Amino acid sequence: METVNNSVQSEKSRRRVLLKLSGEVFGGGKLGVDPDTVRGVAKQIAAAVPDVEVAIVVGGGNFFRGAELSQSGMDRSRADYMGMLGTVMNCLALQDFLEQAGVETRVQSAITMGQVAEAYIPRRAIRHMEKGRVVIFGAGAGLPYFSTDTVAAQRALEVHADVVLMAKSGVDGVYTADPKKDPEAEKLDHLSYDEALRRDIRVMDQTAMTMCKDNNLTMVVFGMEGEGNVTRAIRGEQLGTVVTP
């Protein structure tokens, strides 16, 4: 298995990133999909594709949040599956706008739905990226109780991404405290996973951080707000907070 992994790494000549987009990004702060918002994000991704191989994991919070639905009395597993289906709707919306922007795109789903998406196969995803296509991963891990942050870390490791890019709404990086509650909170340009876990920083999922730490994968937490931030993050420009092992 090690030989296969090494051969994949040696074949990879361009920077390869895994971009995590929250469901809230697709809704523009509302329920459902906001076409103008998704079109804008797609254009930013398209601008970076000629230079970088891009895979994307999307959330589904603009439709359903399994944990919140379960608090209302719904079975957690069933609620999580509803959330997974919501991510696939976001995948299809982003695929449409990326292809309108001239970027070949493939959707891979962890839950089989052959009419709208390919099955999730890591090696096929890698080949798509090598051919200049964007790959969007939907349906989370295909299992309940896994956040899409954790799925982003897992997919990044499976497709041998160089970095995980966590795009956030309403915050431009990691702070010493919640900047909305503490006016003295300071933004951190760099942070180790050990420090983030010790401080119990909640801007990203702790399981995802542990997975990245254990596998020496760098994460960048950055804000969606700001002209061209997604393009800049994909290209590797300095912004947000860099979290390293």
UniProtKB/Swiss-Prot annotation:
GO biological process, one term: 'de novo' CTP biosynthetic process
Residues at which ATP binds: K20, L21, S22, G23, G61, R65, Y175, D178
Pathway in which the depicted protein is active: Pyrimidine metabolism; CTP biosynthesis via de novo pathway; UDP from UMP (UMPK route): step 1/1
Gene Ontology cellular-component annotations: cytoplasm
UniProt cross-references to SUPFAM superfamilies, sorted A to Z: Carbamate kinase-like
EC number(s) reported in the record: 2.7.4.22
Localization in the cell: Cytoplasm
UniProtKB keywords: ATP-binding, Cytoplasm, Kinase, Nucleotide-binding, Pyrimidine biosynthesis, Transferase
Cross-referenced InterPro entries: AceGlu_kinase-like_sf (IPR036393), Asp/Glu/Uridylate_kinase (IPR001048), Uridylate_kinase (IPR011817), Uridylate_kinase_bac (IPR015963)
Activity modulation: Inhibited by UTP.
Residues that hold UMP according to the record: G60, D80, A141, G142, L143, P144, Y145, F146, S147, T148
CDD domains associated with the record: AAK_UMPK-PyrH-Ec
Main location: cytoplasm
Catalytically driven reaction(s): UMP + ATP = UDP + ADP
Protein's UniProt keywords contain ATP-binding: yes
One annotated GO molecular function: ATP binding
Family in the record: Belongs to the UMP kinase family.
Stored NCBIfam families: pyrH_bact (TIGR02075)
Job of this protein: Catalyzes the reversible phosphorylation of UMP to UDP.
Complex and partners: Homohexamer.
Protein name: Uridylate kinase
Organism: Arthrobacter sp. (strain FB24)
